[in-house]
């Protein structure tokens, strides 16, 4: 009887410790959920983070409720076993004591599962906070006429001038590759380019005049050859008729 009473006290203590652990885990999860909700409310994307945390909270709550119900069922069964053991002989108490050794192991397993679930819950919280951080807002423009406004205007002007000079330099380098020159000075390159373009223009005009004259001469030659061809054609027809008449006269 003393042993069974001790076991009963030990089980009651373990049951109380388990309830305390479950309660602490619930409190920790509720506190973490509140902190996460407050942090996420400052962001424009808090709805998704809150939904994710609520889903994890519901799952953890259901698991804890299932664990508590299983614990209550286990404690009820333990009470029934105690009442039955009081009416059994010492031999049966000895046999049942060997079977009760596995109960603390189950409780340790449940506590380990609760600890793992709490760690997983914290991991989901950290993941939600990482994924839904607010983006930094752009700084406001300086007021018109202020020193900062003038400074930015000067910098913008310098940037425009730099791009313009870079574009001009790129064009001059491309021009130096196209014209036959070995000069490296920009002014000389431009002067050479102007002279080269003028020569090309003069050559083009000369070629146009040359091609126009050649075209006229070719058309004149074609006309003369056509007239000569017609003349030869008529002479050939006259000769053919004379030959036909001579053949008929011989017959």
Curated annotation (Swiss-Prot):
A Pfam short name: HLH
Swiss-Prot/TrEMBL keywords: Coiled coil, DNA-binding, Nucleus, Transcription, Transcription regulation
Function comment: Transcription factor that binds ribosomal protein gene promoters and rDNA locus with TBF1. Necessary for the expression of genes involved in assimilation of inorganic sulfate. Also required for the expression of respiratory genes and glycolytic genes. Does not bind to centromeres and is not necessary for efficient chromosome segregationas as does S.cerevisiae CBF1.
Phenotype on disruption: Leads to auxotrophy for sulfur amino acids.
Molecular function via GO: DNA-binding transcription factor activity; protein dimerization activity; sequence-specific DNA binding
Compositional bias segments (type: Low complexity): 40-56, 117-126
Chain intervals with Basic and acidic residues compositional bias: 7-28, 77-105, 144-167
Superkingdom classification of source: Eukaryota
Tagged with keyword Disulfide bond: no
Native source organism of the sequence: Candida albicans (strain SC5314 / ATCC MYA-2876) (Yeast)
Biological process terms in GO annotation: chromosome segregation; methionine biosynthetic process; rRNA transcription; single-species biofilm formation; sulfate assimilation
CDD domains: bHLHzip_scCBP1
Cellular localisation: Nucleus
Listed name of the protein: Transcriptional regulator CBF1
Domain bHLH: 152-200
């Amino acid at each position: 009887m003393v042993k069974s009473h001790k076991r009963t006290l030990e089980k009651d203590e373990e049951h109380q410790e388990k309830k305390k652990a479950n309660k602490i885990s619930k409190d920790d999860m509720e506190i973490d959920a509140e902190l996460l909700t407050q942090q996420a409310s400052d962001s424009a994307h808090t709805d998704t983070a809150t939904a994710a945390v609520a889903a994890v909270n519901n799952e953890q709550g259901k698991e804890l409720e299932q664990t508590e119900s299983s614990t209550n069922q286990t404690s009820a069964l333990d009470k029934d076993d105690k009442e039955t053991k009081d009416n059994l002989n010492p031999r049966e108490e000895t046999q049942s004591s060997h079977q009760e050794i596995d109960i603390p192991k189950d409780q340790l397993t449940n506590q380990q599962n609760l600890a793992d679930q709490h760690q997983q819950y914290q991991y989901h919280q950290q993941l939600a906070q990482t994924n839904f951080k607010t983006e930094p807002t752009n700084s406001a423009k300086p007021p018109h006429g202020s020193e900062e406004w003038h400074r930015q205007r000067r910098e913008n002007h310098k940037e425009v001038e730099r791009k313009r000079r870079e574009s001009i330099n790129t064009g001059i380098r491309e021009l130096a590759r196209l014209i036959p020159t070995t000069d490296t000075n920009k002014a000389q390159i431009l002067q050479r380019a102007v002279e080269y373009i003028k020569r090309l223009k003069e050559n083009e005009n000369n070629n146009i005049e040359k091609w126009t004259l050649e075209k006229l001469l070719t058309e004149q030659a074609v006309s003369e050859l056509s007239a000569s061809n017609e003349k030869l054609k008529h002479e050939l027809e006259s000769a053919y008729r004379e030959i036909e008449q001579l053949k008929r006269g011989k017959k």
